[in-house]
Amino acid sequence: MILKKLSVLNYKNILQSEVIFSPKMNCFFGNNGMGKTNLLDAIHYLSFCKSHVNTPDSQIINSDQDLCVVQGNYDYEGREEEIFCAMRRRQRKQFKRNKKEYDKLSEHIGLLPLVMVSPADADLIRGGSDERRRFLDLIISQQDKPYLHALIQYNKALLQRNTLLKDQSMDASLYEVLEMQLGMYGQIVYEKRKKLVEDFTPIFNEYYQTICGSAEEVGLHYISQLEETELAGKLAMSRERDRILGYTSSGIHKDELEMTLGGYLIRRVGSQGQNKTYLIALKLAQFAFLNKRGQTTPILLLDDIFDKLDASRVEQIIKLVSENGFGQIFITDTNRKYLDEILLAMNHDYALFRVERGEVQPMEE
């Protein structure tokens, strides 16, 4: 899959831009705050109907404007695809595929597989468990529609049960229906998350060791209450306690993904360089996983990934992304030197752009 052209209007600080891309490597350089990350975020938006950092749509629209438009023209295995998104303040956003609007945004997820690596990924290590669950959900949802459906239905039932709890409702029949749904959909989510972690961890370990050049092992450990008990029954037993708390205290929305380095939690023992390497390896493994199981090669977005890495690790990453297994790549950096090194290391078509004050200018070499 190739993104051939991106048209942007009022996406954060990018007021108006139309960019034609290389089918292989696209490099963007410029100072911080100029719009490099926003450009990659607009590409991410076309795949997931949302910002990489979960920015509300109202904050995506340029602060001086009322309308934001993002459109991408893709070559999808020889087939033309046009994806269009328009957002207006205080209105429902439009999301269209080939000029036909989606009934549900969830129908779009997985069509345009994409992996983004950015400084915001640090929250996977230092943030709460919801960040790590979201990471698992994002991988599975791109290649498994039944999983996405189960996750959406689980969250709907969870919201309804929490509303009953806050309202101090005593309607046992309503609780029973919702707890049955939570149990059924929660079991689907649990089993698929568990299987993903089992299949994904060896790939992740291989990428980490390749980048850092050592045999130090990394690990992912999925911890869930469903390992020991059936959810619907547990919810029925904890109903009175949950009513006092005002929320549902058990379920797959409480699951944890432990991330370890050398057998210890990385958030406790990892240096800045180790954390950065860990996250890059995690995302490159995500790319490899999706590429192997999907119908088309994902797009890879690499946003400012070389900061806080020593020269040997930078060299290994450049070598990895220069390999033929990676499809179309978009990479940003304030330091053009790293971008030039990547372009020298690979024998592929490329495009180089300068980003300044929200304007994207192609560079003639």
Swiss-Prot record:
Do you know which InterPro entries this protein is assigned to?
Answer: DNA-binding_RecF (IPR001238), DNA-binding_RecF_CS (IPR018078), P-loop_NTPase (IPR027417), RecF/RecN/SMC_N (IPR003395), RecF_2 (IPR042174)
Write down the species.
Parabacteroides distasonis (strain ATCC 8503 / DSM 20701 / CIP 104284 / JCM 5825 / NCTC 11152)
- Per UniProt, which keywords does this protein have? ATP-binding, Cytoplasm, DNA damage, DNA repair, DNA replication, DNA-binding, Nucleotide-binding, SOS response
Entries under HAMAP family matching the protein:
RecF (MF_00365)
GO biological process terms, alphabetically, are: DNA replication; DNA synthesis involved in DNA repair; double-strand break repair; SOS response
Q: What does this protein do?
A: The RecF protein is involved in DNA metabolism; it is required for DNA replication and normal SOS inducibility. RecF binds preferentially to single-stranded, linear DNA. It also seems to bind ATP.
User: Which coarse location class describes where this protein primarily resides?
Assistant: cytoplasm
Q: Where in the cell is it found?
A: Cytoplasm
Molecular-function GO terms, alphabetical = ATP binding; single-stranded DNA binding
Q: What is this protein called?
A: DNA replication and repair protein RecF
Cysteines engaged in disulfide bonds, as pairs:
none
PROSITE patterns on file:
RECF_1, RECF_2
The family line of this record is:
Belongs to the RecF family.
The organism that produces this protein has a lineage beginning with:
Bacteria, Pseudomonadati, Bacteroidota, Bacteroidia, Bacteroidales
Its gene name is: recF
Q: Which GO terms describe its cellular component?
A: cytoplasm
Residues annotated to bind ATP? 30-37
